[in-house]
Regions:
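A glycine-rich (often HGG/GG-containing) alpha/beta subdomain
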Residues: 1-143, 147, 151-154
């Protein structure tokens, strides 16, 4: 029996303030969230769209770029939305609040990658390599993580 997943959201970029905040949404309610939180009814998959991001009461939060990836052609294998907005603290907080008020919950650390692994989008070696790449602090660590990712890709291609 398949388990129905909930929809998750999280800041995918560095913490504000910054020039841009990137927020990711993934799960079964993504299309509903697009209709509720953005100034459009639908988004063409894999294209960037200039949209208004709105609060639950319809108030404008920001204008940004939104990209929708339809399942299964996304990182997690689920419907996924990425929103690039101005990277101020309040803009980021209000955007996350609107997403959560419209059906998403805040993702746990690593949850997007866990979902990708569970969907067969990547193997454990590649998932670990992604974590190593994110955590790399030296050029040697960076190089090792990239080599680990290349090895994981080659192993997947040979199957």
């Amino acid at each position: 029996m398949a388990v129905r997943r909930d929809t998750i959201c999280a800041l995918a970029s560095g913490p504000p303030p910054s020039a841009i905040s990137v927020i990711r949404v993934s799960g079964p309610d993504t299309r509903s969230i697009i209709r509720s939180c953005l100034s459009v009814e639908t988004l063409r998959p894999r294209h960037a769209h200039l949209v208004d991001i709105v609060a639950s009461d319809g108030a404008l939060i920001d204008t940004g770029l939104a990209t929708y990836m339809a399942e299964p052609a996304s990182y997690t294998g689920e419907d996924t939305l990425e929103i690039s907005i101005h990277g101020g603290r309040i803009v980021t907080e209000l955007t996350l609040k609107s997403l959560m008020e419209n059906g998403a919950r805040l993702a746990e650390p690593g949850e997007f990658t866990r979902r990708a692994f569970e969907a067969g989008k990547l193997d454990l070696t590649r998932a670990e390599a992604i974590a190593d790449l994110i955590e790399a602090e030296t050029e040697a660590q960076h190089k090792q993580a990239l080599e680990q990712m290349d090895g994981a890709i080659e192993a997947l291609d040979s199957n």
